């Protein structure tokens, strides 16, 4: 019976250590965590928390030249978070839309103007 108790305690200790190693702050550490139709964003303020945000829809605000970034964040509680494929402030537009340089909004692409930003520019 003493061996059984020791095994249980060891199992619980392993679970606690495993859970502590998987700590994550916010919704995401990569856009892949957010699923289709969303991306991982981090705000502009110090100690912002990563969150999943919907991709820009027609007429939504967007940021021209906002490529995905890899960031290493440190928080006052000692937690460090590595973000990959994440965006500052807002997600890019949906794939069928483009961020207009003139209006900074998601619009349908138009071949006749140079005012559109192709979202696929930063994709592999």
Curated annotation (Swiss-Prot):
The keyword Disulfide bond applies. Coiled coil: none annotated. Disulfide bonds join 28-40, 34-52, 39-91, 62-99, 93-106. It holds the Pfam family Prokineticin. Keywords: Disulfide bond, Secreted, Signal. The keyword Thylakoid does not apply. Gene3D superfamilies: Lipase, subunit A. One of its GO terms (cellular component) is extracellular region. It is found in: Secreted. InterPro entries: Prokineticin_domain (IPR023569). Residues 1-21 form the signal peptide. Belongs to the AVIT (prokineticin) family. Cytokine directly involved in hematopoiesis. This is Astakine. It comes from Penaeus monodon.
């Amino acid at each position: 019976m003493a061996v059984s108790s020791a095994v249980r305690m060891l199992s619980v200790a392993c679970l606690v250590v495993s859970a502590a190693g998987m700590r994550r702050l916010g919704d995401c550490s990569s856009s892949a965590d957010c699923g289709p139709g969303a991306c991982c964003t981090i705000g502009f303020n110090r100690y912002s928390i990563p969150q999943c945000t919907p991709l820009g829809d027609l007429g939504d605000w967007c940021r021209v030249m906002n490529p995905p970034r890899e960031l290493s964040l440190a928080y006052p509680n000692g937690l460090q978070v590595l973000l990959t494929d994440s965006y500052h402030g807002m997600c890019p537009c949906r794939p069928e839309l483009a961020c207009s340089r003139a209006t900074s909004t998601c619009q349908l692409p138009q071949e006749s103007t140079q005012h559109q930003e192709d979202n696929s520019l930063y994709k592999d």
